[in-house]
Amino acid sequence: MFNKILIANRGEIACRVIKTARKMGISTVAIYSDADKQALHVQMADEAVHIGPPPANQSYIVIDKVMAAIRATGAQAVHPGYGFLSENSKFAEALEAEGVIFVGPPKGAIEAMGDKITSKKIAQEANVSTVPGYMGLIEDADEAVKISNQIGYPVMIKASAGGGGKGMRIAWNDQEAREGFQSSKNEAANSFGDDRIFIEKFVTQPRHIEIQVLCDSHGNGIYLGERECSIQRRNQKVVEEAPSPFLDEATRRAMGEQAVALAKAVGYASAGTVEFIVDGQKNFYFLEMNTRLQVEHPVTELITGVDLVEQMIRVAAGEPLSITQGDVKLTGWAIENRLYAEDPYRGFLPSIGRLTRYRPPAETAAGPLLVNGKWQGDAPSGEAAVRNDTGVYEGGEISMYYDPMIAKLCTWAPTRAAAIEAMRIALDSFEVEGIGHNLPFLSAVMDHPKFISGDMTTAFIAEEYPEGFEGVNLPETDLRRVAAAAAAMHRVAEIRRTRVSGRMDNHERRVGTEWVVTLQGADFPVTIAADHDGSTVSFDDGSSMRVTSDWTPGDQLANLMVDGAPLVLKVGKISGGFRIRTRGADLKVHVRTPRQAELARLMPEKLPPDTSKMLLCPMPGLIVKVDVEVGQEVQEGQALCTIEAMKMENILRAEKKGVVAKINASAGNSLAVDDVIMEFE
């Protein structure tokens, strides 16, 4: 076994690898850029080596710099994590030449699976189900149209190299096939330096389901169930779960056996993932193989008890697998939510800045681990478990140079419904301030009827949120629970407010019992009867709720029980009440006496400023160019200007027809969020 491993990555995955290496008694080396000098993975590692400026192409993916760090520290092996150099065969080759072990598959497997045309041909030869298509090189648009007609519309036009949604077009007719071929070819050449294109049948309403495989260098291979990854936006996964709510045991076994057959066909030896698309009739088709550890690997670990990072390290050290297919048991259900630094109310634009508050929910164990083919620890209890894989800390910076993922929040429970409920509570308990984040959106997904039923495809977000995420309106049942909680909390706050220093407990000024709770445009008249154990909140329709809590004024997180069911609220003080965030909703909750509530209804509502005739900057960024001038008439959808943020260019377009009256910014200007870029007549 190795004595020292270098992790050629950063963020949460570097921290994840360090945890397992530490458990195995292996010392670790971190690498870091200027931007990551104080990063969590640097603090956790036994050693750390500086490798350059913040941009990844000047630090983390420069092979020579990583190799220099390996030589300087004497690391015997390198774990690449995911992204960066994890699927770079030249990096694996450089390590081999240096006599350093790559904790991943052989170079040949990386190359074979990294090319979509080659990988599909190998899959067909290994009797793996593939999407019908043409695997030869397509010379021009006319040939693309001919092949598309032979396959039958709709078709997917794809670049052979690369990924991430680039060089991909769906065509529903000849014209779209002709245009899509040229666009995909251009994008592929610009993005990957390789303009080879192939065409395959497009599966409508597909699910994205992947199989986790684990192979060694002794010819052994197993699969560890599947992961459902259908909830995506812009080809980026947001929510994953294991197992899939859609598959039956026969389909799972067939997919698993084909995934292992493909891995063995390329001499695979490590953890890897074979991705499939699955239609509504449970027909499945090979999509691609990721020759690395997946971001979403924790859900597999939670339902199998297998530490995938440990297995990767043991396989890399030449050990045979200690686990057989018969040892693998899928126990319970696990769900992962990816917490991103982004603003869900502004089209999920990235957010940067300092984490002024970062308090994840407490982590709890999910049951036994499978070690050397034997289960270690107690059998899973009926209680839910929480896991949070992260690479940040309170006071740390979210940088513009890297992926905006803050954490991967996972829950495990005996059933899917219990895992979802555990995730709802965990999301409500997760405190993040200082930056924009997608916690409200994740909460909304967990409460969405289609997700709850398991009836979702890769089009879920596009179909259910066609206008983008606009926040959450709680149903009346939840509003009443929040109203009862707010009334009970207000009573506690009033007792504190009216207490005189030095006065004995239970001798405070009497606090009223009748209040009106106003939230989300609704009034709830209530009466509170308090005792030593909590409060009974009665509504004017005769119903009542029992509220218990140890919340005290000033606490930013309230854990309550309302009629025996948990309710977690993020709490802030506002005049006459609270700002409460729960289940994805952001509520202003006012608690008033009946007379105050009566007068409040007569007060004119303060309207927000009218910005309908302004173009506001949606994120901190740099104006790259302005495409219009004063006096120019613009049409809906017309490009107005381009802003660069987090190394990505974002085109801002006109929301409606109008005439430009004033332009307040020019190319080269740095702007803050909501700065007025231009105004219209």
UniProtKB/Swiss-Prot annotation:
It comes from Ruegeria pomeroyi (strain ATCC 700808 / DSM 15171 / DSS-3) (Silicibacter pomeroyi). Residues 602-681 form the Biotinyl-binding domain. Residues 120-317 form the ATP-grasp domain. The modification N6-biotinyllysine is found at residue 647. This is Propionyl-CoA carboxylase alpha chain. Residues 1-466 form the Biotin carboxylation domain. The active site is at 288. This is one of the 2 subunits of the biotin-dependent propionyl-CoA carboxylase (PCC), the enzyme catalyzing the carboxylation of propionyl-CoA/propanoyl-CoA to D-methylmalonyl-CoA/(S)-methylmalonyl-CoA. Within the holoenzyme, the alpha subunit catalyzes the ATP-dependent carboxylation of the biotin carried by the biotin carboxyl carrier (BCC) domain, while the beta subunit then tranfers the carboxyl group from carboxylated biotin to propionyl-CoA. It comes from the Bacteria. Consists of an N-terminal biotin carboxylation/carboxylase (BC) domain that catalyzes the transient carboxylation of the biotin covalently attached to the C-terminal biotinyl-binding/biotin carboxyl carrier (BCC) domain. Mg(2+) 1 binds at residues 275, 288. Its EC number is 6.4.1.3. GO terms for molecular function: ATP binding; metal ion binding; propionyl-CoA carboxylase activity. The holoenzyme is a dodecamer composed of 6 PccA/alpha subunits and 6 PccB/beta subunits. Pathway: Metabolic intermediate metabolism; propanoyl-CoA degradation; succinyl-CoA from propanoyl-CoA: step 1/3.
